[in-house]
Design a protein with these regions (language model features):
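Class I Rossmann-like S-adenosyl-L-methionine
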Residues: 1-153
Length: 153
């Protein structure tokens, strides 16, 4: 049993629903309320999951300029050049790191890696993990820069 690999958990369903909505809104120009209504009607989501996903969706959309500012400060690759799923998962991850008091740094990073693995495969997991962990380390400095740039916290 010593060689047994740990079981891979599936992506969190509430976060997956939120990321799918964000993808449709930001990449396919869908209406947020229609996309959210569709994805949050999933019978696998309970009321708590729906509330979390909704807060993540609309919190991320409401703070998108600041989120993109933060991502632009730590990524060597321009946001527009990233794979659309990578860009969306990163935005949701930053939404959790910077704006959700109920999500810890390890949870935001780990669940974002699980999401990108599920949505785009293994190739982007290291990039997503690295960007989010760097943001977590530099959060105090970055929030000061965002305020100086006139962006809301």
């Amino acid at each position: 049993m010593a060689n047994r690999k740990p079981a891979k958990r599936k992506a969190d369903q509430a976060r997956l629903a939120a990321v799918r909505v964000l993808y449709q809104v930001l990449e396919e120009e869908a209406f947020s309320n229609e996309s959210a209504a569709y994805h949050l009607a999933d019978p696998d989501l309970d009321a708590r999951d729906r509330a979390f996903a909704s807060a993540l969706i609309f919190g991320t959309l409401g703070r998108l300029p600041a989120i993109d500012f933060y991502l632009g400060r730590v990524s060597k690759r321009p946001l527009k050049d990233l794979d659309p799923w990578v860009r969306t998962v990163l935005r949701a991850g930053v939404g959790q790191l910077f704006y959700s008091y109920q999500v810890t740094v390890p949870a935001a990073c780990d669940e974002s890696v699980r999401l990108i693995r599920f949505l785009a495969g293994e190739k982007a997991t290291g990039f997503v993990n690295g960007i989010l962990r760097k943001l977590a380390r530099e959060k105090p400095k970055l929030t000061d820069l965002a305020l100086e740039a006139g962006l809301p916290r």
